[in-house]
Design a protein with these regions (language model features):
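Conserved N-terminal segment of class I S-adenosyl-L-methionine
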Residues: 1-85, 96-103, 108, 136-144, ...
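Activation segment
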Residues: 76, 93-94, 126, 149
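Short catalytic micro-motifs in class I SAM-dependent methyltransferases
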Residues: 88-92
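Short glycine-dipeptide loop
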Residues: 109-114
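Short, glycine-/aromatic-enriched active-site segment of Class I SAM-dependent methyltransferases
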Residues: 117-137
Length: 186
């Protein structure tokens, strides 16, 4: 659990000072409160109605958070955001959806916004469980995540993660990767 919460803590720190934030693929909203505490407004979206309904009930005391059923590959929210984060989502999408995922994410990001994409590293896949291997159909490497995000952002900062430690060390040895996109390309 600690390593999962560390991912959200990283996003919370990077997005600190951003007022309006979008979480793409909120799932069960596990780490969402950590990011929401520094935001004026946080919209959490997911494709699963059951998760959205469960989050609306379970996390209703967090007043600055709204949940909506939106598939970012097909539609965008009706507002723009200072920051976007997506943890453990892109690896579950068919690779042909990378373009629509990134393009639609960028459509709802302000020009000076920050976009964080987190995913397990393909180089760690040989140590993954069978279940993980079956579900993770679109893993990225340090290079392929940077290359993807560089198509949409002027600056891409790459971070690696091992256990709960986020660092800038050698990407191929990381279990998990973060790409932080800054400055939308025109």
């Amino acid at each position: 659990m600690c390593f999962v919460l560390s991912r959200y803590k990283f996003c919370a720190k990077i997005l600190e000072g951003k007022k309006d934030i979008l979480e793409i693929g909120c799932g069960d909203g596990f780490g969402l409160p950590m990011v929401a505490q520094n935001a004026k407004y946080l919209l959490a979206i997911d494709v699963d109605d059951r998760l959205i309904e469960g989050n609306q009930e379970r996390l209703k005391k967090i007043k600055n958070v709204e949940f909506q059923n939106i598939n970012i590959c097909e539609a965008v929210p009706d507002r723009v955001f200072d920051g976007i984060f997506s943890i453990d989502v892109i690896e579950h999408l068919d690779s042909h959806l990378d373009k629509s995922f990134m393009e639609n994410s960028c459509k709802c990001l302000k020009e000076n916004g920050i976009c964080i994409v987190g995913t397990p590293n393909i180089t760690a896949n040989k140590y993954a469980t069978h279940r993980s291997k079956v579900q993770h159909i679109n893993l990225k490497s340090h290079k392929t995540l940077r290359d993807l995000m560089s198509q949409y952002f002027e600056n891409v900062l790459m971070f690696s993660m091992n256990d709960e430690v986020v660092h800038t060390g050698y990407g191929p040895m990381a279990h998990y990767l973060f790409g932080v996109g800054i400055g939308l390309k025109k």
